[in-house]
């Protein structure tokens, strides 16, 4: 197989937005973790929350995709010149020849969690402004990214827990090798939600202090 070129890459996390911020945090030993103060969660643990996600706005035409996961996606796409390289690839290969392969565990499940709080007390119906397909659904991540760039080709979301963002690279490489696409947007996005926080707490895997996953005396992951 012909070696593939990674022509652009970026990272956004609790360490910061973009490669420079991430590198600086790593070199200075700043973790980005803080005591949990997310939503209504009451857990004695530390979490990594990306700053300013809630301030990110999606284009009006993509309002149905509005959720924290897709807001973080846009933040990442518009960092380190990544979106510019995507648009260059589209100009070179065409809208149908650039694929989207993104991994996620929970996608926009927070929207469902919040919607359940607003169910109709009589019928139990979810609110009319809740859009499952374009927020909670795992594919919403890939569909949003495809729509964001006006792409018309292959798009795939892989949701296999922690391996999701590794498997997408293999999936994209296979499609390029088969000649079905010429370039691909590859990566992974996950945002905080109640399911993840309470889920790991129920498994007794959270820690009341900043996690030390490789420490012999660790008390959580």
Residue positions per predicted region:
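A short local structural element in Rossmann-fold oxidoreductases
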Residues: 197
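Conserved "HGTGT" condensation-loop signature of ketosynthase/thiolase-family condensing enzymes
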Residues: 1-153, 193, 201-220
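Active-site-proximal alpha-helical scaffold in enzymes
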Residues: 83, 138-142, 146-149, 154-188
């Amino acid at each position: 197989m012909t070696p593939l070129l990674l022509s652009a890459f970026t990272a956004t996390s609790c360490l910061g937005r973009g490669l420079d911020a991430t590198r600086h945090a790593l070199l200075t030993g700043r973790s980005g973790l803080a005591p949990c103060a997310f939503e209504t969660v009451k857990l004695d643990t530390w979490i990594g929350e990306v700053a300013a996600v809630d301030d990110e706005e999606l284009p009006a035409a993509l309002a149905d995709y509005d959720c924290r996961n897709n807001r973080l996606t846009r933040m990442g796409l518009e960092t380190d010149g990544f979106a510019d390289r995507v648009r260059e690839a589209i100009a070179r290969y065409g809208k149908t020849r650039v694929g989207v392969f993104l991994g996620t565990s929970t996608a926009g499940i927070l929207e469902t969690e919040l919607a359940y709080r607003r169910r109709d007390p009589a019928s139990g119906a979810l609110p009319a402004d809740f859009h499952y397909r374009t927020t909670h659904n795992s594919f919403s991540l890939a569909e949003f990214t495809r729509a964001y760039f006006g792409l018309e080709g292959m798009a795939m979301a892989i949701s296999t827990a922690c391996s999701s963002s590794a498997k997408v690279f293999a999936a994209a490489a296979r499609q390029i090798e088969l000649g079905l696409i010429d370039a691909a947007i590859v990566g992974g996005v996950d945002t905080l939600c109640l399911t993840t926080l309470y889920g790991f707490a129920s498994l007794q895997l959270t820690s009341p202090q900043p996690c030390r996953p490789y420490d012999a005396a660790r008390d959580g992951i």
